[in-house]
Amino acid sequence: MTAKVFYDELHQYALSHQKNGKPYLGEYQDEKNGEWLKGDNPRSSFYNHSTFCDLVINDLIGFKPRLDNAFGFYPLIPEGKWDWFVLDNISYHGRTLKVMWDATGKKYNKGKGLRVYAEGKEIYRAANLKPAIIKLK
């Protein structure tokens, strides 16, 4: 699957998180027409669990846990689609991490590109969103 295909499908999924113009995420949605099939069953509207967050964190942003003292970074964000994001307060292997992307350097005022911090100290920097194994220092 390409980054563009994943991004487009995730974007469509995110847009489906509404019903009658209000935020909503139910249990069953018709894959062809997008209609919510469970109706107004109260149980249905609390069905999100963690899957959407997993898709964003592990797949779109690309944070991939590992057993060693590193993590994989394999983003599926097509070039030019997101100018910025921050994934903060990641509890990982006894450390607190931050993954920050700023295409222009103007959103977070820390410079252009990708930066990774452990305990507030920069441990990795890259000019673009490219796959990497990032070792904790």
Language-model features: where?
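C-terminal beta-sandwich/jelly-roll accessory domains of carbohydrate-active enzymes
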Residues: N89-K137
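C-terminal capping/lid segments that line or modulate ligand- or cofactor-binding pockets
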Residues: M1-K98, T104-Y108
